[in-house]
């Protein structure tokens, strides 16, 4: 399995770099500082979905956020390895739902980082494919409040896309960050 995965990612790297030469020459070029972003983007694994490991969001809603309600204190939240953005958007939805539940204001912002520039661009766009196989939102979240739904026609028929609303987008700032970089 790993051999196939590595082979596929090397092929992806060569495509991303528009490189047709020997892989060893490409790796030497990366070592010299060329194609570093393309290398990172080709080899990162991006696994996420909305409300992944949802007990964290329940804890945020029930134990953390009420302490900041109407306090005037700003809560700055951080989402590392945020991938395509589903988790920071889940955090933002949790803040807004908690405010409504408590009838109080919570001043919150979210910084979301990832090493992969492609997934950060995807996250900033905030447009996601939605299908019946997509993981469902928790019962306490009203997705229709936070997303616009639209149908897009493609070669295989139609697909449903959901677009994050501006209220959520304004709460999140996306940045490139390598968590293993000590500088």
What are these regions (language model features)?
Residues 64, 68, 95-99, 127:
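Active-site catalytic pocket residues across diverse enzymes, especially alpha/beta-hydrolases
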Residues 84-103:
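Conserved SAM-binding loop of SAM-dependent methyltransferases across substrates and taxa
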Residues 101, 106-183:
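Extended basic-aromatic, gly/pro-enriched interface segments that bind polyanionic ligands
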Residues 1-78:
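Conserved AdoMet
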Residues 46-50, 84, 182:
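Short strand->helix junction
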Residues 50-63, 89, 166-180:
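N-terminal "domain-start" segment that seeds a small globular fold
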Residues 72-90, 109-111:
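Conserved class I S-adenosyl-L-methionine
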């Amino acid at each position: 399995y790993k051999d196939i995965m590595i082979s596929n990612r090397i092929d992806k790297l060569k495509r991303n770099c528009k490189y047709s030469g020997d892989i060893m020459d490409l790796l030497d070029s990366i070592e010299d500082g060329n194609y570093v972003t393309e290398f990172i983007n080709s080899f990162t694994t991006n696994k996420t979905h909305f409300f992944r490991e949802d007990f964290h969001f329940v804890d945020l809603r029930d134990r953390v956020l009420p302490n900041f309600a109407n306090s005037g204190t700003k809560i700055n939240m951080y989402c590392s390895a945020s991938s395509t953005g589903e988790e920071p958007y889940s955090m933002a939805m949790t803040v807004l739902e908690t405010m409504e539940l408590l009838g109080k204001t919570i001043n919150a912002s979210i910084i979301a980082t990832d090493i992969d520039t492609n997934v950060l661009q995807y996250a900033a766009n905030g447009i996601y494919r939605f299908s019946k196989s997509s993981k469902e939102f928790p019962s306490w979240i009203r997705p229709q409040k936070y997303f616009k739904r639209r149908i897009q026609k493609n070669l295989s028929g139609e697909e449903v896309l959901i677009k994050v609303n501006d209220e959520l987008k304004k709460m999140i700032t996306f940045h490139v960050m390598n968590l293993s970089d000590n500088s």
